[in-house]
């Protein structure tokens, strides 16, 4: 499917290769189709040979004789000029010369006509030679290879199966060896079969190309060019249109086939690999030991009931007898077990189509392993007689069938399939179709497809009952030349029969046979000649659900009729009947789960090239019904079935940039593209657009009305083909478009239509506005009809979402239909009830679940359509709500919705009756009244509380109107800009009327009960809720004032920032740079300052206080601790000896030494302080000097490595600098 812009998987094409699948399993359908195609090739070559012989031996000779006779005739048409040249005519001067010129010119004209008739045999021969060399000859080579391996495989298989197990020399190893040899031949046969399918596809497309080129050659000779003016005259203009279509189809098909080359190759490889896995012989030698096979090993007693009916199919050899006297032979039959039915297919005597035998329910059979048979891997199927089946009188005896499989595993699988099927049938319901099928026997539906083989067993298992018919007699048809089916006096090809997945001699008859049948629950020969033997049920498409019926039992419970003629209505033409049979055969019949074919009638079909993307193009046949477009695609043996629901399409447009191209758009804007061929693409677009419009209205037209409309369209299309002026065509297309739009707008989706003019409606609206308290209105870019469907359609969720007091999270939203009701005056109205849960505070109090249980009671909003003028005016009332508020009378709240077309004074609505306006106005009117709960009278004088309450109610009404606008904006954004009315109808539903009165809401009966009693309120506000509302409003006001203050403050700051941003930026940058530099310099100068400051502070702390006296005596030995420069070294032995000898003498000078020591302490402290001060003065400079030296050393060590390593003195100097620098830096603690 063509997909542009969204979700490629949603429209992804699902291609299947029916031909490759049938070739991989070597089915009878495959063999019949390739044999029938060979007969077509032989017929084509015979036609070519006969045509060439006729052209060379008869046509050329006859043409030359005719040309000479023609020249003789032309020379004698007029008297010779010489005869008239001697006074024989009056105009002696010009008549003889005029005759001579006329004879020459007329001769040239005649020769041109003869050349057109003769044709260009050289160009035609070139196209024919290309066909033979590029398609026919390669096909012949592939076919020769196929015939060789098919014959070899069939003969080896027959020999392999014919081995007698009674031979004493038969060993499992020899059987295994034969099986492996057969497998090697089967692999070559499989490859040849797949290659043959590809070759057949190439021949088909090449033949189309040859026919196109031949037509072009013949058409080119029909162009006559005048001698005098050189003007070209087309002698056959009617050929141009369909020849151009054919050329487009051939060119695109060839281009598409090249794109599919890789897919074809992958499909062949996949089929080859899968089949090899399936047919590979077992490597276990015990599987070939015939004498070890026992029934107990083949069937397990613990076989479980399968979840669905088992399926099994394949070739088996069947034992039968022929001739008189009878002799035993073994023949191949394609056997199948499906849906609890066992049956057989076989090739016809001509081997060009598939035939069938009777089908038997599994409970009419008894299956067992047959060890008595002198062949390997045999089993017996015993079919019971009419003890169970009373419908077949010629079945009086039981029939015993003996089948032979090719290997042990295949034998086991067949026996298990029968056993599992019986268990499955017994586990299902006994009134189901599958259960009934298991006990029935079915004869072939038609004589033409029944087995015509004369063997004894085939005749026993092929019977006919009163339901078996002859298609030739019933349909009045026959097979004519080239095996073409003739229906009455018309050839079937005149009904545009499409290419089926499988083509056999009886394919066209099989398609027509669907006229006499309605589906099948099991395989049959009709389906095998169209779709092959494979079950493609999972790939089919149906219009609705419920593919599997529960029961098909008839009244007597014994008969299951499987034939039922299709009954077409009287208005359905014969051509449409044949097209409908094609449609159902290609689209629905492959589904073997169907009780009967869907009863959808085909309305028209068209051929197209379906374009899923920019590269791929598939040849497609599109079948259109009232509700769907079904597409059957067949390109290079790839089949695809898909459908498009018309309910998903909103518009069909002809692509102006590409001729013959249609674009289909769905509601989301998804685009599908198709190139329409062999039909007027504008006519197809008109038909599809009409079906879309018909689908959108409330009461769609019937098939008969649609076909009548299509006939009118076709007649108009034929008339328009005669028109050549572009201006007239444009006007007609505009009129057609206007008419189409008018029909959409005038479709009656309500049950009545009124016709008031615009001024009356406008005056009515003005009068209503004076009667209501307040009116809110808003303009929308959509027609009034579309807006009405958005708000009041039965699928719209606008209500109760638009109601101010409705819970927005309620689960009551759903379809709410309108139903007829009568008002007080007896007039009909449309009424509906919308349930919703009440939420009295949720829209203005964030109180969470406060009083949620009490506030969430279920109430109903009743809407009544008061007046409708379709497409112009819609008036809907909402029944009043009664609200009870403390200290106030009962408040009655009435709401009216009015939708009108936008009124323009310059363009009155009555002059645009056939066109809908592009915009409309929504008016919401509110009326608030206080009434006496007892009398129901309106209160005129309001109290202060009632005035305040009314003010609040009007404020909340405005909030509700804003909510309505928000909901409408959501729907309009979802609808988009195009096709608004149709999208609104599809999205939001229609103003539908219930046909069943029992579906009316039960609350309608109770709706008027409160009118008869005293006035009751719907909504009650308690004092607590009002208090919360008051507190909430106060908080809201305070919060607003706070936010206003902060807003002003932020505004001032922003203003200052704006003013500051206008200052010179360079000045700001300079100031910032100056500040940074000053910070760095002050940091550098502050370090020594604060060091001295700390020293001074320490000094004053130590000595500056008068209240603190510190005395310390420092002796010679103590002074060594402070300074080694002011005393004798401590390790001086002479001084030590002196100290020991004079120790006693020192005591008498102790006082004097003490004073000296104290003085010494003072002097040392002062000296140390001075030393530190002096050191601090030079510390920074010295550190800076050391840093520079260290940097220089580092630079020399990096940039002058030779100098650095050779100069040890420099290295020592640098190391000393590093050490000194480390000493100056304080240690890290």
From Swiss-Prot:
Keywords: Endoplasmic reticulum, Glycoprotein, Membrane, Transmembrane, Transmembrane helix. One of its GO terms (cellular component) is endoplasmic reticulum membrane. Pfam families: BAR_3 (PF16746), PH (PF00169), VASt (PF16016). Its main location: endoplasmic reticulum. InterPro entries: AH/BAR_dom_sf, BAR_dom, PH-like_dom_sf, PH_domain, Sip3/Lam1_BAR, Sip3_PH, VASt. Signal peptide: none annotated. It is a single-pass membrane protein. May be involved in sterol transfer between intracellular membranes. Belongs to the SIP3 family. Interacts with SNF1. This is Membrane-anchored lipid-binding protein SIP3. The gene is SIP3.
């Amino acid at each position: 499917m063509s997909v542009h812009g969204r979700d490629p998987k949603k429209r992804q094409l699902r291609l299947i290769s029916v031909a490759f699948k049938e070739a991989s399993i070597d089915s009878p359908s495959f063999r019949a189709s390739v044999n029938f195609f060979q007969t077509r090739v032989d017929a084509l070559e015979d036609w070519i040979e006969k045509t060439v012989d006729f052209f060379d031996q008869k046509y050329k000779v006859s043409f030359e004789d005719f040309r000479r006779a023609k020249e003789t005739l032309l020379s004698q048409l007029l008297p010779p000029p010489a005869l008239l040249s001697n006074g024989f005519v009056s105009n002696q001067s010009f008549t003889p010369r005029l005759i001579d010129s006329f004879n020459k010119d007329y001769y040239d004209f005649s020769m041109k006509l003869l050349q057109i008739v003769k044709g260009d045999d050289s160009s035609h021969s070139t196209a024919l030679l290309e066909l033979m060399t590029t398609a026919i000859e390669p096909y012949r080579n592939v076919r020769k290879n196929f015939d060789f391996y098919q014959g070899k495989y069939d003969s080896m298989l027959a020999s392999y199966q014919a081995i007698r197990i009674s031979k004493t020399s038969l060993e499992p190893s020899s059987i295994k060896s034969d099986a492996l040899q057969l497998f090697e031949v089967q692999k070559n046969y499989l490859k040849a079969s797949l290659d043959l399918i590809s070759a057949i596809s190439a021949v088909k497309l090449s033949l189309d190309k040859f026919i196109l080129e031949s037509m072009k050659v013949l058409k080119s000779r029909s162009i006559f060019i005048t001698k005098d003016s050189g003007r070209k005259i087309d002698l056959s203009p009617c050929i141009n249109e369909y020849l151009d279509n054919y050329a487009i189809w051939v060119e695109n098909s060839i281009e598409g086939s090249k794109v599919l080359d890789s897919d074809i190759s992958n499909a062949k490889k996949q089929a080859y690999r899968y089949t090899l896995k399936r047919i590979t012989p077992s490597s276990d030698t015990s599987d070939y030991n015939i004498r070890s096979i026992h029934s107990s090993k083949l069937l397990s007693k613990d076989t479980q009931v399968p979840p669905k009916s088992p399926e099994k199919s394949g070739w088996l050899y069947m034992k039968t007898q022929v001739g008189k006297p009878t002799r035993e032979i073994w023949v191949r039959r394609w056997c199948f077990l499906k849906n609890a039915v066992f049956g057989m297919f076989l090739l016809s005597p001509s081997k060009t189509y598939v035939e069938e035998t009777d089908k038997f329910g599994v409970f009419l059979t008894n299956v067992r392993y047959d060890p008595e048979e002198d062949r390997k891997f045999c089993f017996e199927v015993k079919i019971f007689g009419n003890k169970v089946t009373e419908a077949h009188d010629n079945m009086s005896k039981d029939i015993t069938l003996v089948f032979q499989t090719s290997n042990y595993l295949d034998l086991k699988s067949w026996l298990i399939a029968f056993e599992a099927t019986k268990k499955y049938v017994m586990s299902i319901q006994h009134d189901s179709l599958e259960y009934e099928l298991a006990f029935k026997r079915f004869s072939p539906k038609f004589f033409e497809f029944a087995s015509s083989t004369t063997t004894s067993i085939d005749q026993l298992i092929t019977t006919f009952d009163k339901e078996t018919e002859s298609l030739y007699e019933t349909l009045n048809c026959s097979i004519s030349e080239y095996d073409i089916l003739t229906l009455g006096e018309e050839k079937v090809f005149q009904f545009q029969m499409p290419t089926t997945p499988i083509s056999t001699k009886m394919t066209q008859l099989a398609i027509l046979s669907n006229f006499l049948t309605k589906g099948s629950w099991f395989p049959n020969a009709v389906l095998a000649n169209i779709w092959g033997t494979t079950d493609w049920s999972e790939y089919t498409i149906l219009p609705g659900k419920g593919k599997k019926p529960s029961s098909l039992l008839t009244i007597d419970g014994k008969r299951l009729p499987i034939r039922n003629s299709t009954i077409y209505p009287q208005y359905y033409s014969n051509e449409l009947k044949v097209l409908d049979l094609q449609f159902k055969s290609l689209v629905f019949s492959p589904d073997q789960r169907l009780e009967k074919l869907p009863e959808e009638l085909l309305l028209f079909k068209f051929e197209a090239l379906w374009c899923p993307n920019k590269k791929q193009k598939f040849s497609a046949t599109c079948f259109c019904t009232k509700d769907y477009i079904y597409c059957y695609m067949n390109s290079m043996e790839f089949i695809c079935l898909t459908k498009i629901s018309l309910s998903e399409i909103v518009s069909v447009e002809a692509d102006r940039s590409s001729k013959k191209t249609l674009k289909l758009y769905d509601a989301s804007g998804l685009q599908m593209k198709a190139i329409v061929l062999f039909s007027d693409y504008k006519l197809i677009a008109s038909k599809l657009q009409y079906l879309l419009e018909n689908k959108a209205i409330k009461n769609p037209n019937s098939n008969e009305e649609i076909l009548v409309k299509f006939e009118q369209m076709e007649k108009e299309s034929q008339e328009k083909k005669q028109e050549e002026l572009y201006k007239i065509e444009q006007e007609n297309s505009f009129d057609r478009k206007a008419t189409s739009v008018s029909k959409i707008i005038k479709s009656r989706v309500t049950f009545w239509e009124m016709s008031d003019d615009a001024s009356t409606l406008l005056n009515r609206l003005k009068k209503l506005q004076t009667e209501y308290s307040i009116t809110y209105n808003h303009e929308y870019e959509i027609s009034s009809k579309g807006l009405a469907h958005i708000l009041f359609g039965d699928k719209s969720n606008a209500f109760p979402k638009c109601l101010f007091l409705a819970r927005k999270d309620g689960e009551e939203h759903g379809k709410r239909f309108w139903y007829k009701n009568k008002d007080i005056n007896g007039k009909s109205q449309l009424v509906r009830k919308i349930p919703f849960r009440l939420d009295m505070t949720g829209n203005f109090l964030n109180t969470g679940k406060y009083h949620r249980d009490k506030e969430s009671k279920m109430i109903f909003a009743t809407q009544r359509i008061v007046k409708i003028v379709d497409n112009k005016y819609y008036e809907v009332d909402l029944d009043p709500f009664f609200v009870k508020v403390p200290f106030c009378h009962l408040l009655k709240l009435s709401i009216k919705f009015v939708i009108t077309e936008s009124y323009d004074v310059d363009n009155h609505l009555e002059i645009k009756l056939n066109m809908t306006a592009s915009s409309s106005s929504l008016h919401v009117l509110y009326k608030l009244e206080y009434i006496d709960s007892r009398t129901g009278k309106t209160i005129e004088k309001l109290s202060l509380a009632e005035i305040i309450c009314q003010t609040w109610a009007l404020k909340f009404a405005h909030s509700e109107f804003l909510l309505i606008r928000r909901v409408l904006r959501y729907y309009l954004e979802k609808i988009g800009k195009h096709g608004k009315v149709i999208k609104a109808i599809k999205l939001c539903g229609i103003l539908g009327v219930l046909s069943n009165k029992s579906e009316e809401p039960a609350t309608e009966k109770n709706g008027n009960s409160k009118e008869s009693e005293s006035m009751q309120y719907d909504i009650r506000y308690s004092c607590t809720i009002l208090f919360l509302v008051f507190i909430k409003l106060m908080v809201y006001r305070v919060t607003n004032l706070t936010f206003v203050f902060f807003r002003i403050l932020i505004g001032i700051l922003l203003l200052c920032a704006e003013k500051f941003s206008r200052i010179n930026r360079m000045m700001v940058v300079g100031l910032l740079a100056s500040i940074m530099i000053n910070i760095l310099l002050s940091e550098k100068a502050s370090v020594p300052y604060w060091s001295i400051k700390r020293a001074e502070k320490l000094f004053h702390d130590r000595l500056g206080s008068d209240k603190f006296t510190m005395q310390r005596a420092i002796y010679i030995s103590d002074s060594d601790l402070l300074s080694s420069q002011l005393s004798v070294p401590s390790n001086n032995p002479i001084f030590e000896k002196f100290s020991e000898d004079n120790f006693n003498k020192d005591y008498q000078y102790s006082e004097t030494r003490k004073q000296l020591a104290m003085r010494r302490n003072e002097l040392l402290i002062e000296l140390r302080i001075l030393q530190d001060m002096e050191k601090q003065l030079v510390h920074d400079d010295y550190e800076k000097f050391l840093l520079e030296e260290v940097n220089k050393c580092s630079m020399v060590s990096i940039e002058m490595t030779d100098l650095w390593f050779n100069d040890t003195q420099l290295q020592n100097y640098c190391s000393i600098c590093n050490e000194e620098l480390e000493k100056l830096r304080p240690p890290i603690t």
